[in-house]
Amino acid sequence: MTNIRKTHPLMKIINHSLIDLPAPSNISAWWNFGSLLGLCLGIQIITGLFLAMHYTSDTLTAFSSVTHICRDVNYGWIIRYMHANGASMFFICLFLHVGRGIYYGSYTYSETWNIGILLLFTVMATAFMGYVLPWGQMSFWGATVITNLLSAIPYIGTDLVQWIWGGFSVDKATLTRFFAFHFILPFIITALVMVHLLFLHETGSNNPTGIISDADKIPFHPYYTIKDAFGFLLLISLLLTLVLFSPDLLGDPDNYTPANPLNTPPHIKPEWYFLFAYAILRSIPNKLGGVLALILSIAILAAMPLLHTSKQRSMMFRPISQTLFWILVADLLTLTWIGGQPVEHPFIIIGQLASFFYFFLILILMPTSSLIENKLLKW
């Protein structure tokens, strides 16, 4: 009798994705982040669902409903902090996952890569709207500043902002719709993840060498199921350590003050995972230019396959490209630091230089270094 997992229509899908999937024999821990992102998404949906049971999306009660969750709901505090810090874990895994894709040339699977970029934008939008929901000072002013950027769009900008706000300022209508979108988007993300995996399984996984590995494949189960399970254990340990020992480490103290439209906080800044993009936005003195740079800072990933000039796929055997890649990482860390600093000397010029180098590295230096490495291959 044939095994049920190979015949049953539903089990067959699971079998081909998680059990009998042929996987390269040499993929390293950098390939764990896909499954870790799946775990993060699961944690966020489950904790978010339980939070939504007690949360009220009204300007008068939103802040106190979050306080109520933390104080009165059974284990509400851990659910709330798992959700808040789970978002940070989500973005850590996302950045490492994208970084892996750039380093090992995974972007040559263009459909998988493009769906990934779409996922990144969607997750960023979801996180932004989620940050508005507790209705603290930084929630309110963050929402005001970021939505206001749309007014830079010529002709329709002002109308568009008022349409998104549902009025003439960030108010009850804005909070209610943000809650609605924040609730629905994770399910759209889940659907996109399935499409992402569908395209990935069309080609099979890349590997550190960047060489086609069809001749040397191993079954996903048990080799990579156990490896993923170990990754899950590490991620959950890290998340629980953060939640139980310093849950507010990555948050902003201003968000423990209820939203007040009459009092602007001294430094308006987003959560840490948006600081690099925020620094790029602020480095351009023109509003529309800043908005375009902000969008391009992520959208530039779509140009990666076009900018690939090397004869080798992976950076594993390309020391010049490796050096530039790590300079890019250092540049992004610099931008993250600058995004959290006040707009004054010397931070302004550091931010402008770091923003310039971010685009210069990706658009000019990395493709050029690849061409030089191609020449060196002939020596």
Swiss-Prot record:
A ubiquinone binds at H201. Keywords: Electron transport, Heme, Iron, Membrane, Metal-binding, Mitochondrion, Mitochondrion inner membrane, Respiratory chain, Transmembrane, Transmembrane helix, Transport, Ubiquinone. GO terms for molecular function: metal ion binding; ubiquinol-cytochrome-c reductase activity. It comes from the Eukaryota. Its cofactor is heme b. The chain crosses the membrane at residues 33-53, 77-98, 113-133, 178-198, 226-246, 288-308, 320-340, 347-367. It is a multi-pass membrane protein. It is found in: Mitochondrion inner membrane. Its main location: mitochondrion. Heme b b566 binds at H97, H196. Component of the ubiquinol-cytochrome c reductase complex (complex III or cytochrome b-c1 complex) that is part of the mitochondrial respiratory chain. The b-c1 complex mediates electron transfer from ubiquinol to cytochrome c. Contributes to the generation of a proton gradient across the mitochondrial membrane that is then used for ATP synthesis. Heme 1 (or BL or b562) is low-potential and absorbs at about 562 nm, and heme 2 (or BH or b566) is high-potential and absorbs at about 566 nm. The cytochrome bc1 complex contains 11 subunits: 3 respiratory subunits (MT-CYB, CYC1 and UQCRFS1), 2 core proteins (UQCRC1 and UQCRC2) and 6 low-molecular weight proteins (UQCRH/QCR6, UQCRB/QCR7, UQCRQ/QCR8, UQCR10/QCR9, UQCR11/QCR10 and a cleavage product of UQCRFS1). This cytochrome bc1 complex then forms a dimer. This is Cytochrome b. It comes from Ochotona koslowi.
